């Protein structure tokens, strides 16, 4: 039974969540800062506002209607983004800490800033 695929898709652990501020660290949009709009855990990708803009040419659906050119944000791989501190203006990896009340929070390693 070697090589049999599982029926359930694998979901990868994401280091970013919706609403996080991130900086693109590689690719065409390297250096851009934006907010994560959507996460796609099955493919380990994220959609970042105003990053990886694509154009789509849409054909007219009805007679007499004109075609359109739409722009949208395409997903990029989560390994190509890094958390960004707005206060310090620096990108950083994250770590996890327990607070006094027992909550596990995400912390930027370079600045010590608590994310959530």
From Swiss-Prot:
GO terms for cellular component: ribonucleoprotein complex; ribosome. One of its GO terms (biological process) is translation. The keyword Isomerase does not apply. One of its GO terms (molecular function) is rRNA binding. Residues 1-27 are annotated as: Disordered. It holds the Pfam family ribosomal_L24. Keywords: Ribonucleoprotein, Ribosomal protein, RNA-binding, rRNA-binding. InterPro entries: KOW, Rib_uL2_dom2, Ribosomal_uL24, Ribosomal_uL24_CS, Ribosomal_uL24_KOW, Translation_prot_SH3-like_sf. It comes from the Bacteria. The keyword Ribonucleoprotein applies. Part of the 50S ribosomal subunit. Belongs to the universal ribosomal protein uL24 family. One of two assembly initiator proteins, it binds directly to the 5'-end of the 23S rRNA, where it nucleates assembly of the 50S subunit. This is Large ribosomal subunit protein uL24. It comes from Picosynechococcus sp. (strain ATCC 27264 / PCC 7002 / PR-6) (Agmenellum quadruplicatum). The lineage of its organism: Bacteria, Bacillati, Cyanobacteriota, Cyanophyceae, Oscillatoriophycideae.
């Amino acid at each position: 039974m070697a090589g049999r695929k599982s029926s359930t898709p694998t979901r990868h652990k994401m280091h970013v969540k919706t609403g996080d501020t991130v900086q693109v660290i590689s690719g065409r949009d390297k250096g851009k800062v934006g907010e994560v709009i959507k996460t796609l855990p099955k493919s380990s990708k994220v959609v970042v506002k105003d990053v990886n803009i694509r154009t789509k040419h849409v054909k007219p659906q009805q007679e007499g209607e004109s075609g359109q050119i739409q722009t949208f944000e395409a997903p990029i791989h989560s390994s190509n983004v890094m958390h960004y501190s707005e206060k310090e203006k620096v990108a950083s990896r994250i770590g996890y800490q327990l607070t006094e009340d027992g909550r596990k929070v995400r912390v930027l390693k370079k600045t010590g800033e608590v994310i959530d």
